[in-house]
């Protein structure tokens, strides 16, 4: 990690705000805790699993924490526990309690900070630019780690979109422009899901890196692309200037093939087009981005 844990001491605290209950969940008070006892639910973060922001007691000491309960298919709480136990960093969550029997769950201590989406707001003046180099360097720091971990689990996003999908989207001109299938050569430790929602900021520095459930040894360029491509509603990383600032920060600690990164970004954008059909503004942005990508590759 680029941020030295000692740099975080004395920084002002900023607490994340989370929504009220937005779907049916398990009752976290019925979970078989060992060293943690929840006292009050403070919020329900949006996530694939059931996640609760709570006030509670850890070995008798008052703490704020997050309880993650496996819900979605493919959830791997045990992988996250194994990885977090090796990191020992002030900017990664400390494990307070867990259980892998029955319905697996994990309790981690809260880290202070805000998401860049909150800090940058509408990002009218590219306020994001002053954060993106450290964002890129933080991911490069993860890629330098040498820890015990399994290969990342296969995901559809790793594979070139099917010709039928490209045809349905009228994107046939993109055929053949995606990276070759991933191999086991030159793998590095990858976060697996580092996007703006999983990184916190305080006093203009990274204060937290969250959600290591999908982490493991995998493809460096895909992990970078996953961090870079724009999600629906996101107001930053819309411009080439922002992307280059991120990559500039990444190159402070690591190297990458920028052309392959861009091809993986295109791959991810196609998959998001398939599911984000009702967000007209996002779809228009993605199609314009993909058209520019195709022109760069001499296809349009």
Regions found by a protein language model. Give the residues of each.
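An alpha-helical support segment within catalytic cores of ATP-dependent transferases
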Residues: 20-33, 144-192, 196-204, 286, ...
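Conserved protein kinase catalytic core
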Residues: 74, 115, 199, 217-219
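Helix-rich C-terminal or lid/interface subdomains of diverse kinases
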Residues: 226-231, 235-300
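Short, glycine/acidic-enriched loop or turn micro-motifs at the edges of active sites
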Residues: 112, 194-196, 214, 226
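ATP-binding pocket architecture of kinase catalytic cores
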Residues: 41-150
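Active-site Asp-x-Gly
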Residues: 187-189, 202-244
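Protein kinase-like catalytic core scaffold
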Residues: 65, 91, 106, 188, ...
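Juxta-kinase regulatory segment immediately upstream of eukaryotic protein kinase catalytic domains
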Residues: 2-40
